[in-house]
Amino acid sequence: MIINYLDKVPKIDPEAKIFKTADVIGDAVIGKGSSVWFGAVVRSDVNTIRIGEDTNIQDNATIHVTTALYPTTIGNGVTVGHNAVIHGSTIGDNVLIGMGAVVLDGCRIGKNSIIAANSVLLGGTEITEGVLVAGNPVKIKREVTAEEIEGLKKSAENYARYARNYLTYSKDSIYSQTDISMIIENLTSC
């Protein structure tokens, strides 16, 4: 569902893809070519969420914020894996947040980094550019290779293609551009 909250209406680029079982709430901006998948929640009810271009928020991921302290900003070409949680943090471009990873308030993740599946970033953790981290709490394991950086880009490209395929072959599961425009117009006029 696409939901307004306290007169804040999501801003969704016409080329973004939102699945009908996902929730996008309040002061959220979803960039060009990005996708929010089945069961994912982008809940910007008490602060802002900004999602860049060509980013995918996979099934059952949760993106949230902290009142007045920590908005969430997610860069371009980011892959947020299934069941991941990002709360009040800043994620650079071309990052992988692995399945089930938890990123808590005030974290900053540099571009071209990989957060391993089920890792936990405690509040205020800063991850430099181009590293792989894992664990609870996370520790830097090594630098990311050039091949892995290309793989991060490929992951974002793949999810953009998958979303387009759903729009073509499973139209009932995903909002069309017309659907999104009508919903936003109705929310704005309420």
Regions found by a protein language model. Give the residues of each.
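A positional/architectural concept
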Residues: D7, I12-T67
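Glycine-rich hexapeptide-repeat left-handed beta-helix
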Residues: M1-K11, D45, E53, D59-T62, ...
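Short proline/glycine- and basic residue-enriched helix-capping loop/turn segments at helix->loop/beta transitions
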Residues: T79
